[in-house]
Regions:
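A short beta-sheet element
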Residues: 83, 108-110, 121-163, 338, ...
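Sequence-specific dsDNA recognition surfaces
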Residues: 48-70, 85-114, 283-300, 315-344
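A short glycine-rich beta-alpha junction/loop motif
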Residues: 137-145, 178-201, 367-374, 408-431
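Short, positively charged
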Residues: 157-185, 387-414
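Non-catalytic DNA-recognition/assembly elements of restriction-modification systems
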Residues: 1-66, 199-297, 429-481
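Short hydrophobic-aromatic micro-motifs
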Residues: 80-83, 117-120, 310-313, 342, ...
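Short, surface-exposed loop/turn microsegments at beta-strand edges and helix-strand junctions
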Residues: 69-79, 88-91, 95-98, 110-112, ...
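Conserved, well-structured beta-alpha core segment at the onset of a catalytic domain
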Residues: 130, 135, 158, 169-176, ...
Length: 481
């Protein structure tokens, strides 16, 4: 029995909180039973007793009926459709989807107003998010559940979201996940989740903390936009040229680039390079380039596991940061995995899928990135600041070059040889520092936002385990941070 875990459960208790009548050992692991014992030792309820609405995209009708009335749009339209990828990135502006008014009205059973708790069905099943108020019509995307609570519920959505993201809450949710590939969670499981009951005083403090965190996050985005505007105003890049006629002779087209497709020669690209010629520029990679480019590994899904080294994919990366990876890799995936860990000031740059996303590492981090993320290291960071370069890589200057090079592919792929030849404008060091300062202000505000949210989650966990008084005292000690 050495190394084995045993749980002794009375037969009469097997059906408790077991709506699927599971009898497997996984369901009765000690960590699950202990989490339940902690919640049930104090006042508690279930989501079923507290919600006024638990719905999803498919509540609007059969697959066939929905398909006849639903079209997902890339360009801005009447209503925004919230997806897991947007929630993970905490970005509701870039690379988002929309639906028309007729589609929004058809999807009447899954309208989102802000303040709801959204829960993943698959992918990272059970992962929860607090939906912000976007001040526009919003429709719920596929593969998400939405919970709206009663007016007289014993818990509010902010506290529910915090609880579901604590160690105890996530353990209870994890017990409800079923299936093999893909793992899923269903409505019945969501309804049965046990939740703790707290005093109004404690919950109001948590709500204020999360509001403060959201305000810091808003300020962080505003600071980043200021940095983007400095670059945009100096370079005067126009990415909205709608002209689609371009006349080229053979020496200016195929003989020069090897491309014959019309998309490659759109006037907006000519306008971009004409604007760049007004400034000092340098190629991104190559012998005389700005950076050294290194590749990571692509281990394949057979190597994915629940414990080990976090595996960062393109879907985890935005210009604002890296979301918590749900996939891990074995620690023996390669002989010396630490050589794959990105170091401080390394710029992660996506070449597949959503191409051209850049994020600069704020510190040495023990993660392994997908082969779709290149590692860029600035050769001379005193002349070209990594924060400045990262902002340029995320700007229309580089996004237009990515669009031109990868156009026409069903799955976007940006060849490393093309990435090496990306043209980067080099502004004077004073302007670079001004831009970098705004970027650093943005990330400092974001860290403060994340810290406040983390403190609120820890306070919920402490209140469950030690009582509200202990949690409030702990928060008071950190009020000056």
């Amino acid at each position: 029995m050495d190394g084995l875990e045993c749980s002794e459960v009375l037969f009469s208790e097997i059906k408790n909180d077991n709506e699927k009548y599971r009898f497997d050992s996984e369901f009765f692991q000690k960590k699950f039973l202990m989490a339940y014992d902690i919640i049930k030792s104090q006042p508690y309820s279930t989501i079923e007793n507290e919600y006024s609405c638990l719905t999803d995209f498919h509540a609007n009708g059969s697959y066939e009926h929905i398909a006849q009335n639903y079209t997902l749009l890339d360009n801005k339209d009447y209503a925004y459709m919230v997806r897991t990828t947007d929630l993970e990135a905490n970005d509701f502006v870039n690379n988002v989807k929309y639906v028309s008014k007729s589609t929004y009205d058809f999807l009447s059973k899954s309208k989102v107003f802000g303040g709801e708790v959204l829960i993943n069905k698959i992918g990272s099943p059970g992962r929860s998010f607090l939906m912000p108020n976007l001040n526009m019509p919003v429709s719920l995307g596929m593969n998400l559940f939405m919970i709206r609570l009663k007016n007289d519920a014993t818990i509010d959505t902010t506290t529910l979201w915090l609880y579901l993201n604590t160690s105890i809450g996530s353990t209870i949710v994890k017990r409800k996940i079923n299936g093999t590939v893909p793992l899923t969670i269903d409505k019945a499981a969501i309804k049965s989740i046990y939740i703790p009951c707290f005093s109004n005083v404690f919950r109001n403090i948590l709500i204020m903390m999360v509001k403060a965190a959201n305000e810091k996050d808003k300020q962080a985005k505003e600071s980043y936009v200021k940095a983007e505007n400095i670059l945009r105003n100096i370079l005067e890049i126009n990415q909205n040229n709608s002209s689609n006629i371009s006349i080229k002779n053979m020496s200016e087209s195929f003989l020069d680039s090897g491309r014959l497709d019309a998309e490659y020669y759109q006037p907006k690209y000519d306008e971009l390079f004409t604007s760049l010629k007004k400034h000092t520029t340098q190629l991104l990679g190559g012998k005389d380039g700005i950076v050294i480019i290194k590749k990571s590994i692509e281990p394949g899904s057979d190597s994915y596991c629940d414990e080990g080294i976090p595996f960062v994919r393109v879907s985890n990366v935005t210009k604002y940061g890296i979301s918590e990876p749900s996939i891990k890799l074995p620690r023996n995936i390669v002989a010396e995995p630490d050589k794959l860990y990105p170091k401080r000031n390394t710029i992660l740059f996506s070449k597949d899928g959503s191409v051209g996303i850049a994020y600069k590492m704020e510190k040495d981090t023990e993660v392994i990135t997908s082969g779709a993320l290149l590692h860029l290291t600035v050769k001379n960071p005193l002349e070209i600041l990594p924060d400045y370069l990262t902002l340029v890589l995320n700007s229309p200057i580089v996004q237009l070059q990515a669009e031109r090079d990868s156009n026409g592919a069903i799955i976007q792929h940006w060849k490393p040889s093309d990435i090496e030849n990306v043209v980067i404008p080099i502004l004077d060091i004073k302007t670079q520092r001004e831009i970098a300062s705004k970027v650093q202000d943005s990330f400092a505000l974001r860290r403060k936002s994340e810290q406040l949210s983390e403190y609120a989650k820890q306070a919920v966990e402490m209140a469950i385990e030690q009582g509200e008084d202990a949690a409030l005292a702990w928060l008071k000690e950190r009020s000056g941070e």
